[in-house]
Design a protein with these regions (language model features):
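Short, surface-exposed recognition loops and adjoining beta-strand edges that mediate ligand/DNA contacts
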Residues: 1
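Substrate-binding clefts and catalytic carboxylate motifs of secreted carbohydrate-active enzymes
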Residues: 4-11, 15-232
Length: 232
């Protein structure tokens, strides 16, 4: 709200903490804000010193909507969507001199009571105890790390009540072979390290999801199990 205070534009460079889609506005506002600030101040180097949203690895949603930051439901899938879209905008705006994900690890924050974790800021890509790397961690790994990898997102969303779902995979390989319950389902290509396959039909009971890729003559794979229990 204070973007255009004159004193902010005295230095040669400036960075902002911006939380579009969390504390203010919507996720898709981020790109427009970058365009606006660069148009107004083309000679000032602009950075983003913080961006991120909270996620509890036990909270999940097929169609995540923007949560209440101070509420108790912080689905991992919304954090995934947020970082996918923000990183896409960061790549699209080369005038940014620096950006920083907020934050690497969940951390103590005494005044908070949100995301089912009292006293914790849950914007980390890794849980506070360092034991669980959230899905968004692997999104950035697919984008930033050259070591071949395949990772099925929403893997902790194990208990399903809807048969029709999407499988989304993060990988730095060129194509992914998707198998569902041992049967070849499809081969997916992607140019942005996010591989999607919609309208997957789960069967009642346990469903094995297997994603496989080839790179440099080697095979890389990941798997998870989703259990479907249809409402009676």
């Amino acid at each position: 709200m204070f973007d255009d205070r004159p004193q902010h534009w005295m230095p040669d460079v400036i960075s902002w903490n911006k939380y579009f889609g969390w504390y203010v506005g919507a996720i898709d506002d981020f790109g427009g804000w970058l365009d606006m600030m660069h148009k107004k101040h083309p000679d000032t180097r602009i950075g983003v010193s913080e961006y991120g949203v909270g996620a509890n690895t036990q909270d999940h949603s097929l169609n995540p909507r923007q949560p209440n930051p101070g509420g108790q439901f912080h689905p991992e899938e919304y954090q995934n969507l947020y970082h996918e879209k923000h990183w896409r905008e960061i790549e699209r705006h080369p005038f940014l001199y620096a950006t920083a994900v907020w934050v690497a690890f969940d951390f103590s924050s005494d005044g908070r009571n949100e995301g089912k974790n009292p006293g914790v800021n849950d914007k980390g890509l890794v849980t506070q105890d360092r034991k669980i790397k959230k899905d968004a961690y692997y999104f950035y790994k697919a984008n930033w790390n050259s070591a071949p990898m395949v990772y099925i997102s929403s893997r902790r969303f194990t208990q399903r009540t809807e048969a029709n779902c999407e499988v989304k995979i993060y990988s730095n390989c060129e194509s992914i072979a998707l198998l569902v319950n041992g049967k070849n389902y499809t081969t997916i290509d992607s140019s942005d390290h996010v591989f999607r396959c919609a309208d997957i039909m789960l069967q009642p009971g346990a469903n094995t999801i297997l994603a496989t890729a080839r790179k440099n003559g080697q095979t890389f794979s990941d798997s998870c199990t989703w259990n479907l229990s249809l409402p009676k």
